[in-house]
């Protein structure tokens, strides 16, 4: 019981955003079998962010698996005030992300799957541009890897 209470405390400290839910179809002799995938980003808005990917027969189960996976993939991000310390460009598979520091009050200027990663990491002012593939899985991973490469 004690362990369960600890997990609930950890879950309360992180916010979660569902980035993508996909339906996957397997064609069998009797028809089609549907399964679902979920991509979730979690963060505490204080410099810790993570992503998770879950697959299941039902959407809520896939989301729960993705959240559990995200708790295992947490990374720490160096934040300088409300923005990042320097420009950075990172590529993951066919997705490329460019992140630039912005002056205070600019907000998070990011599209697609990069926005929840930056917001949940606690970055309030940043400019970003995604180039190439906008596949949510690759874009989330490229953004998180770029953030981990930022030097304080």
UniProtKB/Swiss-Prot annotation:
UniProt keyword terms in alphabetical order: Ribonucleoprotein, Ribosomal protein, RNA-binding, rRNA-binding
Start and end residues of each S5 DRBM domain: 14-77
Any one biological process term the GO annotation gives: translation
An example molecular function term from Gene Ontology annotations: structural constituent of ribosome
Keyword hit for Translocase: no
PROSITE patterns found in the cross-reference section: RIBOSOMAL_S5, S5_DSRBD
Family annotation (InterPro entries): Ribosomal_Su5_D2-typ_SF, Ribosomal_uS5, Ribosomal_uS5_bac-type, Ribosomal_uS5_C, Ribosomal_uS5_N, Ribosomal_uS5_N_CS, Ribsml_uS5_D2-typ_fold_subgr
GO cellular component, one term: small ribosomal subunit
Pfam families, per database record: Ribosomal_S5 (PF00333), Ribosomal_S5_C (PF03719)
Gene3D superfamilies for this protein: 3.30.160.20, 3.30.230.10
SUPFAM superfamilies in the record: dsRNA-binding domain-like, Ribosomal protein S5 domain 2-like
Presence of keyword Ribosomal protein: yes
Annotated family: Belongs to the universal ribosomal protein uS5 family.
Record text about domains: The N-terminal domain interacts with the head of the 30S subunit; the C-terminal domain interacts with the body and contacts protein S4. The interaction surface between S4 and S5 is involved in control of translational fidelity.
Family annotation (PANTHER family): MITOCHONDRIAL RIBOSOMAL PROTEIN S5
NCBIfam families hit by this protein: rpsE_bact
Biological role: With S4 and S12 plays an important role in translational accuracy. Located at the back of the 30S subunit body where it stabilizes the conformation of the head with respect to the body.
Record's subunit section: Part of the 30S ribosomal subunit. Contacts proteins S4 and S8.
Protein name: Small ribosomal subunit protein uS5
Source organism of this protein record: Sulfurovum sp. (strain NBC37-1)
């Amino acid at each position: 019981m004690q362990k369960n209470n600890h997990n609930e405390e950890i879950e309360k400290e992180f916010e979660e955003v569902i980035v993508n839910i996909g339906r996957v179809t397997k064609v069998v002799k009797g028809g089609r079998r549907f399964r679902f995938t979920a991509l979730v980003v979690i963060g505490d808005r204080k410099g810790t962010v993570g992503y998770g990917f879950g697959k299941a027969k039902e959407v809520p189960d896939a989301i729960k698996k993705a959240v559990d996976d995200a708790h295992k993939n947490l990374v720490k991000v160096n934040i300088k005030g409300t923005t990042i310390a320097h420009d950075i460009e990172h590529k993951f598979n066919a997705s490329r992300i460019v992140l630039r520091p912005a002056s205070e009050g600019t907000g998070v200027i990011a599209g697609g799957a990069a926005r929840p990663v930056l917001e949940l990491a606690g970055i309030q002012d940043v400019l970003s541009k995604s180039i190439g593939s906008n596949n949510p899985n690759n874009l989330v991973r490229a953004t998180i890897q770029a953030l981990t490469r930022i030097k304080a």
